[in-house]
């Protein structure tokens, strides 16, 4: 049944309305994320959320954030919801505050690691988890006018109020998470990416006594993620080495992920964080079934090294919501993604870059060793390369496996590697690219096969 009108916000957007991807609704602000779309998203999220009560909205530093928040607020209040706006904050602050305050849900306005011109909307339910697939589908159907909901009855307009002071609760949780551990005098560099981490990242480390150097430490929506942060580690590596720091941490735009470097500038990705933190929990007998949860992107060297420690690595599809679901189902204590999303059952089961950074730093010094020495105890990663092939046709990108030339090339490559490597090809859920990943024991094989498969994909998926 096609919906004729969505009073009080006007007609549905039809089939042109974008849907939820790997991490919410995301796209170019003003073109994909229009005020009209954000108004409708706010209204239908307000209707679809099951619990009664207010809804939280946080944002990163993007210039378009104020527009998106204003339109979402208009939609939510039109649905009768009170709205508490948090202002600039890390994404993990939203689910934490949902659970602490007992509100109906929350939204985070951010496009994470995407360029400044993009923006996005992440939606969380009453439990602080990302909105379920069935609820996302319900919102999408309402946006497109493919379904209808019962009338609300008498119109009630909600009230919006600024609530930036609530972020103090999140800051307190960061400090409480490390118990009595300290970082007094430890030289540390932070790359705050001009984004959400500027709201509390430096404060968290200073409160622990660290001797801090801060890069890109002010909110700047025109420079968020530009040649900095967790997707561009070179500035952090240079600063750590030049200043003789013990370690450094870089965050993405909304601070839900983190990558680290040691005092020698070596990169510590999410796989290494899981291995090192997981080893501590294993020794403390605080890791049920010796299980870690990661995604299909995690390195084969990580998996085999963890198995040698008697552990089990459970793999999920890409996306921290899949890691979250697997951890809940299995009772796992720790999980995450190679990209730096780390979820701890003891700390709210939400990817939190700042919390992960303070945990890694304080756990390291609680053992009386440097991060470099600790990294030496980690696994030896297999050479791995990821190439993004731009494919603008969404149908071809999503259904890439129908391309015989590409699947034949993959099969041939897999046969040549045997059990000593892996190939993963998938359509990105956040960008118009096909991701081609190859890992093997020999780096020359990785380079050759990645280049070959990317060329095949480029040739056969971008035909006129």
UniProtKB/Swiss-Prot annotation:
Gene3D superfamilies: Alpha-D-Glucose-1,6-Bisphosphate, subunit A, domain 3, Alpha-D-phosphohexomutase, C-terminal domain
Binding positions for Mg(2+) per the UniProt entry: 112, 252, 254, 256
Cofactor(s) demanded: Mg(2+)
Enzyme class: isomerase
UniProt-annotated catalytic positions: 112
Post-translational modification: Activated by phosphorylation.
Stored InterPro entries: A-D-PHexomutase_a/b/a-I (IPR005844), A-D-PHexomutase_a/b/a-I/II/III (IPR016055), A-D-PHexomutase_a/b/a-II (IPR005845), A-D-PHexomutase_a/b/a-III (IPR005846), A-D-PHexomutase_C (IPR005843), A-D-PHexomutase_C_sf (IPR036900), A-D-PHexomutase_CS (IPR016066), Alpha-D-phosphohexomutase_SF (IPR005841)
Keywords carried by this UniProt record: Isomerase, Magnesium, Metal-binding, Phosphoprotein
Swiss-Prot/TrEMBL catalytic activity: alpha-D-glucosamine 1-phosphate = D-glucosamine 6-phosphate
Modified residues (Phosphoserine): 112
CDD domains, A to Z: GlmM
Function description: Catalyzes the conversion of glucosamine-6-phosphate to glucosamine-1-phosphate.
Family designation: Belongs to the phosphohexose mutase family.
Official protein name in the record: Phosphoglucosamine mutase
Organism: Synechococcus sp. (strain CC9605)
Organism lineage string: Bacteria, Bacillati, Cyanobacteriota, Cyanophyceae, Synechococcales
